[in-house]
Amino acid sequence: MAGELRIMENKSREDINLSPVSKIEIYSFFDPFSSDCFKLSAILSKLRIEYNQYIRIRHILNPSLKVLTKCQAQSTSNFDNIALAYKAAELQGRLRAERFIHLMQNEIIPKRDIITKSMICDCIQNAGIDLEVFKDDLQKSKLTESLKIDLHIAREMEIEQAPSLVFFSEDVHEEGLKVEGLYPYHIYTYIINELMGKPIEKNLPPKLETYIQQQQLVTMEELLTIYEWPEKLLNKELKKLAIQQKIEKLKYPDGDFWKSKMPKIKSK
């Protein structure tokens, strides 16, 4: 897979006033329209499951001219501009904003759909975000300022493409490691283990049923990444859940997806 591993100087983080973290901080720069970014989200979900006590992931919509132009071209107003919508969602919590962008990618990437106001509303509510507060926040000029801050961060870290991950240890005097492009899962776990500098224990993933209920829409590739089961075994378990009317299979141009028919698990 294409990509670049590059050491960065630590000044990129020191120049930015961000809350400190106790262990490893990962900056994830993404393009909401990129299929590689969509694939990386499965890897990040697995990292968060297995290494939750050791890492903190911060998602930043890559505010490059190319990405922002695509966001503008897909929109008719601030309401359906996904860049501004993501920044407004962040005001109600980063985890909810991440959930929102994941739901949006589930809509626009496999279906190749155009972004609409109703799509934004559905994903906002499904992410546990207050819709009325979100609408008010969309009118605030500070969203544009927030995008400018993200642009500053991206420039300081010399981000040239999405997806890109930047790993920092808890020592601000240590250099960061930038990974551009998409790599196999073990590359990211190797980096985490090297930065920790000691043996660390991994957490087990939740039950398959629970994970699909949390995510609502998942790809086969995502589930294979999370669970590392043989594809034949995974298909067998998915068929069991389908027979129980807990999930259903959907076919899209970019492949098959599995959708939860179970009640949504509310975001905290």
UniProtKB/Swiss-Prot annotation:
Localization in the cell: Cytoplasm
HAMAP family, alphabetized: Adapter_SpxH
Native source species: Staphylococcus aureus (strain MRSA252)
Superkingdom of the organism of origin: Bacteria
Keywords: Cytoplasm
GO cellular component entries: cytoplasm
PANTHER family tied to this protein: CLPXP ADAPTER PROTEIN SPXH (PTHR13887:SF47), GLUTATHIONE S-TRANSFERASE KAPPA (PTHR13887)
Subunit structure comment from the entry: Interacts with Spx.
This protein's record includes keyword Membrane: no
SUPFAM superfamilies: Thioredoxin-like
Major subcellular site: cytoplasm
Biological function: Adapter protein required for efficient degradation of Spx by ClpXP under non-stress conditions. Interaction with Spx stabilizes Spx and exposes the C-terminus of Spx for recognition and proteolysis by ClpXP.
Pfam families linked: Thioredoxin_5
Lineage: Bacteria, Bacillati, Bacillota, Bacilli, Bacillales
UniProt name for this protein: ClpXP adapter protein SpxH
Family under the similarity heading: Belongs to the SpxH family.
